């Protein structure tokens, strides 16, 4: 059995996406694939009384794994466990529990282990990436999210110093296209000279930051006024319709990509302009229902309309808090990431390092 622990320097760097891309590829090549998450810090209750990890459940379903979601998680950090650990009211050996859970899923060819969202996550529990990789004796891939030319080097070196012998390599994710050649031709060789393997430099792709209408509705607790079946439509741009109608039409048309227009429910003039300008979704604020003509035209154009209770500012803030941080829940997004990953990640080198070839 081979195992690969996938961690990152900061949250929302692409760990789950890499687990899925590798998992689906390994399965296509005939390997029996397993998945394990030693520590989940964000319990999710799909039904009352049943706490799970949402990412683990998503991967279980996507990779069609036979285990229950509970079996894929070592420790689920519930509020009660967090309180017990803080006050020293428990004598549980969490690492032993992680080891026991991990042993139960080792009857695979390859196990992908989704680690912490940072190198310090779980340190107070003794379940940080360094401790887990050493205890389970597994190799680690560290994902660095690109911010600037300096941070990619700093973060790769930090991962190397923290994980050292366990580090199989690093991957730099979401690199702007204009920076990719410099990253590959200058930064990567510099890191390699220091003994830090850079296995991939994945370009930034705007489509992967998109959010679906269903996800918008969930975040905003919105009501569908039209076309709930269009919930899988992806939105790449947000436009706030606070300007005058005369300025709105040319401005909205100039903005590329799939757009959602956020405007007051009483702004029927702006709503109709948005529909004419090929927006993909209308988000109406203030819990004010639009005129019937707006809903009729939205149906004609195939545009879902969401009604939210919040005002426009609150709505924008709520969406911005999650924009670019949603999982690859749509097959089109997942397939696009897989393509980028295959084109820009040295899979042959990874296979050699893992002893798969």
Which residue stretches match the model-derived regions?
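Non-catalytic interface/targeting segments
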Residues: 201-263, 320-357
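N-terminal phosphate/diphosphate-binding loop that engages ATP/GTP or pyrophosphate donors
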Residues: 3-13, 17-92, 97, 101-102, ...
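Structural motif
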Residues: 3-4, 32-34, 57, 109-111, ...
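Fold-independent oxyanion-binding glycine-rich loops
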Residues: 8-9, 38-39, 72, 114-117, ...
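Conserved catalytic-core segment of NTP-binding enzymes
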Residues: 116-196, 266-328
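Ligand-binding beta-strand-loop-alpha-helix segment within the catalytic cores
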Residues: 74-79, 89-92, 189-209
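Flexible, charged surface loops at secondary-structure boundaries
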Residues: 104-107, 250-259, 274-278
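Phosphate-binding/switch loop-helix module in NTP-utilizing enzymes
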Residues: 82-125, 130-135
